[in-house]
Regions:
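Glycine-rich, basic loop-to-helix element that forms the pyrophosphate-binding segment
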Residues: 60-78
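Short, well-formed alpha-helical segments that are part of the catalytic scaffolds
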Residues: 12-30
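A recurrent flexible, glycine/aromatic-enriched loop bordering the glycosyltransferase active site
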Residues: 132-150, 203
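A short, conserved alpha-helix in the catalytic core of glycosyltransferases
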Residues: 142, 147-150, 154-159, 163-192
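Conserved donor NDP-sugar-binding/catalytic core segment of glycosyltransferases
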Residues: 94-126
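A conserved acidic beta->alpha catalytic loop
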Residues: 27, 38-47
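Short aromatic/hydrophobic "clamp" motif used to bind/position activated sugar donors
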Residues: 83
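Non-catalytic, C-terminal membrane-associated alpha-helical segments of glycosyltransferases
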Residues: 210-218, 229-287
Length: 287
C-alpha cells in the first residue's frame, strides 16, 4: 500500500517566477513528483529547472492561463490520490506533510481539502465557522489557495477550479462549491507553511494594475454566482460610485498612479457586470 507522503503530487503554477521557485522546490521531498505549469513561453525556465531537479516536470503553457486554469492543467497530469497546490513563493516546513498525515488518519480520509497553517495567523477565519474536532484540526469554510492538499478521490468536479476566474477568489469559489456538496475542509494548525505574498508573479506597477482589475472582476463574478443578483448588484453599486469618486479626486490632485489604479478597478467591475471575460494581462497594459 502506498504511503500518504508518497501519494502526493505537488502542483505549482508560475509566471516567470524563477527568482523564488528554487526555495519552494528545495523545501519539498525529492521523492515527490512536482508539476510546474509555467504561464509563459519561456522554455529556458523549463530547461534550467528540469536539469537541476529530477523530480520536476515543467509544462510550458505558452500563454498566461491564470491560477485556476493553470492548476487545472497541472491536476490533469496528477496520477496520485492527492494534489498539493502550492504557490511558487511559498515553502513547506519539515513537519508540514507529517502533520497533514496525522490529520488524514484522524479524519479517516473523509475530507476534500486539508491545508497547513500559515505561520503568521493563517487567513482571516471567523471562529464561528470552526467546528473543533481536536485541538489541532479545525473544520473551516475555506482555506487560502497558496497551500492546500486536495483529496481528488473526494472532489467530483469536472474542472476543479472555475476557469472563468483568472485571478482572485478561485480557491474561495472551489471551497464554496465543495461545501455546497457537503464536502469537508480542514485547517491543520500544527502543519506550517511559509508564504511571501505577491513575490511569485512580480510586483511592477503593471502587475498591480492587473491585480486590481481582476479583483473587481472576480468579486462581482463570485457574488453573482454564489449570492445572486441582489447582493452582487448592491456591492457593485457601492464599488462603482466609490471608484468614480476616487478617480475624480485623483484627477484633482494630479495623482496619476491613483487615477490609473482606480480606473482599472472600475474597468474590471464594468467588464464583469457586462458578462465579459477576464481578459486583461500584465503584458497588455500600456501606461
Amino acid at each position: 500500500m502506498i504511503s500518504f507522503k508518497d501519494n502526493i503530487t505537488f502542483v505549482i503554477v508560475t509566471f516567470n517566477s524563477q527568482q523564488v521557485i528554487t526555495k519552494c522546490i528545495e523545501s519539498i521531498n525529492s521523492n515527490n513528483r512536482i508539476i510546474i505549469i509555467e504561464n509563459s513561453k519561456n522554455y529556458l525556465i523549463k530547461k534550467s529547472i528540469e536539469n537541476k531537479f529530477k523530480n520536476v516536470e515543467v509544462v510550458i503553457a505558452g500563454e498566461n492561463l491564470g491560477y485556476g486554469c493553470g492548476n487545472n492543467l497541472g491536476i490533469s497530469k496528477v496520477k496520485t490520490q492527492y494534489a498539493f497546490i502550492l504557490n511558487p513563493d511559498a515553502y513547506i516546513d519539515e513537519n508540514t506533510i507529517q502533520e497533514l498525515e496525522t490529520a488524514q488518519l484522524l479524519l479517516k480520509d473523509k475530507f476534500s481539502i486539508i491545508a497547513p497553517n500559515f505561520y503568521n495567523n493563517y487567513g482571516n477565519f471567523s471562529k464561528k465557522n470552526y467546528i473543533d474536532i481536536s485541538r489541532k484540526v479545525l473544520e473551516v469554510d475555506f482555506v487560502k489557495g497558496f497551500a492546500m492538499l486536495l483529496n481528488l478521490k473526494n472532489i467530483n468536479f469536472r474542472s476543479i477550479f472555475d476557469e472563468k476566474i483568472f485571478l482572485f477568489l478561485e480557491e474561495i469559489d472551489l471551497c464554496k462549491r465543495i461545501k455546497n456538496q457537503n464536502g469537508k475542509i480542514y485547517l491543520v494548525s500544527d502543519s506550517k507553511i511559509y508564504h511571501s505574498e505577491k513575490k511569485g508573479s512580480g510586483s511592477s506597477f503593471e502587475v498591480e494594475l492587473c491585480r486590481n482589475w481582476h479583483w473587481m472582476w472576480s468579486l462581482y463574478y463570485y457574488n453573482l454566482k454564489h449570492s445572486g443578483k441582489f447582493k452582487a448588484y448592491t456591492i457593485a453599486f457601492n464599488k462603482f460610485f466609490l471608484s468614480i469618486i476616487k478617480i475624480l479626486f485623483s484627477l484633482i490632485v494630479f495623482n496619476k498612479k491613483k487615477y490609473l489604479m482606480n480606473r482599472y478597478r472600475l474597468s474590471g467591475l464594468v467588464y464583469s457586470i457586462l458578462n465579459k471575460p477576464s481578459w486583461i494581462r500584465p503584458e497588455n497594459i500600456k501606461i
